[in-house]
């Protein structure tokens, strides 16, 4: 694979239509529950949704009010989006007059302590999940933790790897796949700024959010409580959003699975003086799981992650170490405020194209300084991406290229991928998506952030826009009928999830303290 260029690799996989029609995709969408007045819900997790610990479709993220909707893996884009829509419809039917906040950045958030941590019952596993969130609260504050996004899980089928690598032993295949996914990840850091440019939807913030952060950014003010940057795309991905200064010193590389796991394992074992000052157990009450830089692996902030489905009791890094990378998780998508389900078909198809292009495009190793240069491009795009004169770095050698020129170059090759994918599927959907979004590169006013900022300006603030969109989406979903699942299926899953939680609680045989000692035994 190493000696072939992009077009040769594309030609190679185009020989097998299954290689590009059997892509695996899964979606996770986060959304805050709000009252009909637009305030953060203080109600517990709706009973009709079952157990947040064990329901396979609906859970909670950081807060009791922060829902997370999870689809299974699908090879069909329409099925994927219909499943996500059905899960939303079911959820709305359990929420009374509450609604879902339609944006990534929270609004109308009062004090930190107004945000109730997600509750998962009395089992050791459930208590550990809540305690982890308690640690996040002490470390970063609750307001940052209720920023929401959409995560896109993505994998290539065996037929794809067969076309690229031919016959291999099981171990060689596993290593080749992991190496290819890490090549994709490096290219994602190089070129993935296209995602916040096109789909970033957090150009403005509520003052209630900004008040909790000391910012040196020169915001413009709108009305009495909205702050924005004229050309911003995704403030969620900036230092104001979900990032961690404490993690900036971590050196986690993406040149190989071994390098990545070494960095991750070091991070969960590295003590932090700042976090030690918080205390782990104070006056008999736990404040965090431990005082290391990362309490657990999931605390690592990253715009993309290599993943493998873990077995029971297995940590994410152990799963990767056992059998290599199985799929990747894209974490840079803002919630699309104009979609009732937070994402559209065009966005999914673009990600299909972009991630396929990223794995087929040669990807040299990347040291820490080069990674820092690429991260700087991301920061420029999230703060100033719609500036028509914006220049981005090409690596660390001082060369620069305009975002627009670079975007057009990438789209030229994405178009080649689209032709091959459409031929395999027997339609023109990928080419149509590609053509539409290329227009967004040429005209920043078409991007999601531009559309949203225009609406915010017209309505004199982000709060009223969010409230209006939440009401519209609620109505839209209420008028839809299920397209994939059924009400009985959802009801059964909710009932079974409660039974599963009870079984877990009844199955505990050790104290919570012993449970934590056992879980972190390998860190000692």
Swiss-Prot record:
Tree of life domain: Bacteria
PANTHER family on file: GLUTAMATE--CYSTEINE LIGASE (PTHR38761:SF1)
EC numbers, comma separated: 6.3.2.2
UniProt keyword Transit peptide present: no
Disulfide cysteine pairs (residue numbers): none
This protein's record includes keyword rRNA processing: no
Pathway per the UniProt entry: Sulfur metabolism; glutathione biosynthesis; glutathione from L-cysteine and L-glutamate: step 1/2
Similarity annotation: Belongs to the glutamate--cysteine ligase type 1 family. Type 1 subfamily.
Name of a matching Pfam family: Glu_cys_ligase
Transmembrane segments: none
Reaction(s) the record says it catalyses: L-cysteine + L-glutamate + ATP = gamma-L-glutamyl-L-cysteine + ADP + phosphate + H(+)
Database matches in SUPFAM superfamilies: Glutamine synthetase/guanido kinase
GO biological process terms, semicolon-separated: glutathione biosynthetic process
Name assigned to this protein: Glutamate--cysteine ligase
GO cellular component, one term: cytosol
InterPro entries, per the entry: Gln_synth/guanido_kin_cat_dom, Glu_cys_ligase, Glut_cys_ligase
Signal peptide: none
Class of enzymatic activity (EC top level): ligase
GO molecular function: ATP binding; glutamate-cysteine ligase activity; metal ion binding
